[in-house]
Swiss-Prot record:
It comes from the Eukaryota. Its EC number is 7.1.1.2. It catalyses: a ubiquinone + NADH + 5 H(+)(in) = a ubiquinol + NAD(+) + 4 H(+)(out). It holds the Pfam family Oxidored_q3. GO terms for molecular function: NADH dehydrogenase (ubiquinone) activity. The keyword Translocase applies. This is NADH-ubiquinone oxidoreductase chain 6. Keywords: Electron transport, Membrane, Mitochondrion, NAD, Respiratory chain, Translocase, Transmembrane, Transmembrane helix, Transport, Ubiquinone.
Amino acid sequence: MNIDIFLFYLFSIFALISSLMVIGLTNAVHSVLFLILVFCNVAGLLLLLGPEFFSFMLIIVYVGAIAVLFLFVVMMLNIKLKSTNISFSSLWPIGILTFVILLSQFFSSFYELDLVKFQGKELFFISWANENSNLTNIKVIGKVLYTHFNLLFLICGLILLVAMIGVIVLTMHQRVDVKKQQIALQLARTAPNVIKFIILRRKR
């Protein structure tokens, strides 16, 4: 067996198992950890297919930022498990219906790919980025992004800018009844105006 095919099946199996563990575990921290493992396996699949830029971006963005953020949020919230009275027998029809829909989608996609014709042939993956005049996928993505989709790219930048400003405005609460420290007035004060002697009279 080719090493690429072996790694493809290995990453696929681990990604499926990790996905099942994400939705099957009751501990939220463990679910987030398995979600990070899913992202790593998908990044390995993308690395096998050719676009290494997307693979590293998946690890940097999802694993390095979003998944770690989820993990810290879940750990700081200290989510407590609550016992529910839902019986699993009532969930069987929904589970069977979902399984049948997913299985039909799998077989329909398997039939459309027509993998029967590829029997006896060695399966390999075509790197379309390298086929395009021997350009790397980063150059291809940059060329397409800054030429054909330059307007959409600018719109995405404006949306992110508006979102950033909106978050700052929503989190900036100014209270009027709070006494603020004025450094300039404090430094301009002199000793005769500040120090005041009080004469205390003793009671007889």
